[in-house]
């Protein structure tokens, strides 16, 4: 299972921690290779389960993703905070990350762990990119995304919202502000509409556009 996981998370270790009720430890184990444990506990495609030894040798695989979610949910239910990893001493280097989606957040997380001073720029009002604007709340509650982002803030990562590349700042202006390097995690935000008749009429929109409007509480009236 671990070798099949794209992040190579130490699945046997965190499953054992869940078994013993050590939920904080389980979160920390996941967090070493995956900086978004709570989010992935709800939306990852759990391909690790396809190669679970129990599935191969007995009958059904261990519900690995569900156990990840369970560990995170138990921390929340207990009124506890998610564990914050220790970061390396500051190395004096400043990094700008443009985009607060999964790519930008992962980049910011690991840079901060290694002592870099990281600032994340987001063009929209809310942080998370597709995590906030592309995934419905019934799959990924906004409050859980906010809790995960609190870990980043406690690590020392800074966030700047409603500032867009090419409009409010440029690569050159970031360099002039003293950033030593810039990471662009802009996402793939254009939706597709199938080639069919009347697809260009008013009111027809892509699924991504509709989800963004729902998340921003600007969804069109679809009653009828």
Stretch-by-stretch model annotation:
Residues 71-89, 147-167, 191-224:
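Glycine-rich dinucleotide-binding loop and its adjacent helix/turn
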């Amino acid at each position: 299972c671990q070798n099949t996981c794209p992040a190579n998370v130490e699945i046997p270790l965190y499953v054992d921690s869940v078994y013993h009720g050590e939920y904080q430890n389980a979160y920390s184990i996941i967090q070493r290779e995956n900086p978004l444990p709570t989010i992935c506990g709800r939306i990852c495609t759990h391909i690790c389960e396809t190669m679970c030894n129990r599935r191969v040798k007995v009958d059904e695989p261990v519900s690995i993703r569900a156990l990840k979610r369970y560990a995170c949910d138990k921390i929340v239910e207990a009124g506890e905070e998610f564990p914050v990893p220790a970061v390396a001493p500051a190395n004096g280097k400043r990094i700008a990350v443009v985009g607060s989606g999964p790519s930008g957040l992962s980049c910011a997380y690991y840079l901060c762990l290694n002592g870099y001073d990281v600032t994340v720029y987001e063009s929209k009002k809310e942080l998370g990119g597709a995590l906030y604007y592309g995934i419905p709340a019934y799959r990924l509650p906004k409050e859980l995304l906010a809790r995960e982002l609190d870990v980043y803030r406690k690590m020392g990562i800074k966030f700047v919202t409603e500032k867009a590349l090419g409009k409010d700042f440029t690569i050159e202006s970031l360099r002039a502000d003293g950033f030593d390097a810039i990471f662009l995690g802009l996402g793939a935000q254009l939706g597709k509409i199938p080639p069919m008749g009347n697809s260009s009429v008013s009111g027809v929109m892509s699924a991504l556009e509709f989800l963004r409007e729902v998340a921003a509480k600007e969804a069109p009236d679809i009653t009828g």
